[in-house]
């Protein structure tokens, strides 16, 4: 059920170029780094999508990047000018504070790649042992009467970040 096949972006780009139709790739979360070595299942990095040639790329400035809640549009100047000419643009453009915050988070990638300066990624990549210690610390603060009453325990599990951050 659901989606059973996916058309490669490169094929969609070829059709778009052939018929002069702009191709938009909506990444959802967006990340600048491959997160495989941190055991974080994520989509392709934005740079890999750029190489595939869509005219417009959309992704989140917050979810995986760790910046302020925002949407990022990567496109040619021509496409950006078309987008900016839409009257809705004024209502959805970022303010100066959001732009300054995005600049800081993007600079952290440029300077450090993956680092503890990026809270979102450092929390997602936190080792399981660290999470167990935190869980035990919190658990130890719960009165034993409540633990017994509600049948509370610390259990191993595997979950993924929500809100569409990860595929």
Describe each region flagged by the PLM.
Residues 59-61, 112-115, 159-167:
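Short, flexible, solvent-exposed loop/turn segments with mixed acidic/basic and small polar residues
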Residues 109-141:
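Structural signature of PLP-dependent enzymes
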Residues 139-167:
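Catalytic-core signal marking the mid-to-C-terminal active-site face
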Residues 30-33, 122-126, 130, 141, ...:
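Active-site rim loops that border cofactor/substrate pockets in soluble metabolic enzymes
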Residues 37-40, 129-134, 162-167:
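Short glycine/threonine-rich loop-to-helix capping motif typified by GTGT followed
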Residues 1-108, 142-143:
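Conserved PLP-enzyme active-site core in the AAT-like
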């Amino acid at each position: 059920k659901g989606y059973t096949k996916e058309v490669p972006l490169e094929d969609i780009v070829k059709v778009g170029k052939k018929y002069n139709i702009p191709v938009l790739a909506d990444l959802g979360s967006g990340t600048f780094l491959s997160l495989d070595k941190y055991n974080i299942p994520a989509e392709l990095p934005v740079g890999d999508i750029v190489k595939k040639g869509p005219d417009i790329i959309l992704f989140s400035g917050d979810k995986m990047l760790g910046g302020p809640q925002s949407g990022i549009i990567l496109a040619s100047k021509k496409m950006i000018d078309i987008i900016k000419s839409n009257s809705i643009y004024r209502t959805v453009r970022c303010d100066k504070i959001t732009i300054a915050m995005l600049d800081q988070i993007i600079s952290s990638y440029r300077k450090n790649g993956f680092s503890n300066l990026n809270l979102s990624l450092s929390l997602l990549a936190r080792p399981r042992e660290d999470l167990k210690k935190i869980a035990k610390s919190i658990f130890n603060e719960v009165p034993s009467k409540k633990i017994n009453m509600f049948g509370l325990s610390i259990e191993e599990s595997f979950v993924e970040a929500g809100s569409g951050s990860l595929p």
